[in-house]
């Protein structure tokens, strides 16, 4: 009986800690948007992630999206990347 009680209490505590950590992690993402020459079809999200990682070395980017913007004489791509907020 003691073992079952300890098991249930530890299970509930682990569940609570994990659920709180998920909420904190979800709230700590910030966006950074940059415009780069070129087209998203060439490298897409991987190119945006590589550019952002090289430019902002202290930030760890989680994911990026790439959007093409067609102008008169050239195409630009907008990289919208999510990274963990500092502070």
Swiss-Prot record:
Q: Where in the cell is it found?
A: Secreted
Note the SS bond partners. 30-85, 40-66, 48-79, 64-81
Protein's UniProt keywords contain Signal: yes
Please tell me whether the keyword Secreted is annotated for this protein.
Answer: yes
Q: What is its main location?
A: secreted
The record's keywords, sorted A to Z, are: Antimicrobial, Disulfide bond, Fungicide, Plant defense, Secreted, Signal
- The signal peptide stretch is 1-26
An example Gene Ontology biological process: signal transduction
Pfam families the record matches = SCRL (PF06876)
A single GO cellular-component term from the record reads:
extracellular region
- Family classification: Belongs to the DEFL family.
Name-wise, this protein is Putative defensin-like protein 231
Organism per entry: Arabidopsis thaliana
């Amino acid at each position: 009986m003691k073992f079952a009680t300890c098991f249930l209490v530890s299970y509930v505590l682990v569940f609570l800690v994990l659920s709180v950590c998920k909420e904190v992690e979800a709230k700590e993402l910030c966006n950074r948007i940059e415009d780069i020459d070129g087209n998203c079809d060439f490298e897409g999200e991987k190119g945006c992630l590589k550019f952002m990682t090289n430019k902002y070395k202290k930030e760890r980017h989680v994911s990026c999206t790439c959007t093409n913007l067609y102008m008169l004489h050239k195409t630009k791509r907008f990289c919208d990347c999510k990274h963990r907020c500092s502070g």
